[in-house]
Regions:
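Small-residue-biased structural context
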Residues: 1-188
Length: 188
């Protein structure tokens, strides 16, 4: 399933990372410009990484027959809904509020922000595929075990795509945004 999506694997261009070289990741928390809002934003990214891993692991347990189908359906509905809803809300806020603020603070990163916005567009496609497959799997769990296993197998491919997408994308966002915040302090 991973090959069905256009997931970016290339690094953000070197020239866009100028502030990252001045403010490397290891120095962020000690910087006086590193505030709670930034810490919470990074915390949301950590939650997305963990949740993607949990949903993939639970999908594998179902496929291995080590998970009760009804329990799996309930967890998939709950955690899948949290993953999709929060990712959509989070990157929508970034595209319409956060990224314009970063661009205004330092237009040198506009090309990097465009890359991240394109990532968000592709992530929307992947999340829609996840939602469709998860909903179909939940219905089939109650109707036809063989078809449910086939659908959960497809779902596993989609959630694996999400899980492989998130580390690169979120790391690039962090390494583009946090140095701007530390350098320009657009939020005071």
């Amino acid at each position: 399933m991973k090959s069905d999506f256009e997931i970016r694997t290339a690094d953000i261009p070197y020239e866009i990372q100028a502030l990252l070289r001045e403010y490397p990741r290891g120095s962020w928390e000690a910087h006086p410009g590193f505030k709670d809002k930034t810490r919470h934003w990074l915390g949301a990214h950590q939650m997305f990484r963990r949740l993607g891993n949990v949903v993939r692991s639970e999908t594998e347990r179902y496929l291995d027959r080590s998970s009760d189908p009804d329990d799996f359906a309930g967890r998939l509905s709950h955690r899948g809904g949290i993953l999709v809803g929060n990712l959509h809300g989070h990157h929508g806020w970034e595209d319409y509020s956060y990224f314009p603020e970063l661009s205004a603070a330092d237009p040198r990163v506009d090309a990097g922000l465009e890359i991240l916005e394109k990532d968000h567009e592709e992530l929307d496609v992947v999340l829609d595929a996840f939602t469709e497959s998860a909903n179909r799997a939940i219905k089939l769990i109650h109707l036809d075990d063989t078809q449910a296993c086939d659908e959960v197998g497809r779902l596993h491919g989609v959630v694996t795509t999400i899980e492989s997408f998130l580390p690169r994308h979120l790391s690039d966002e962090e390494e583009l945004a946090v140095p701007i915040i530390l350098h320009h302090r657009p939020r005071g």
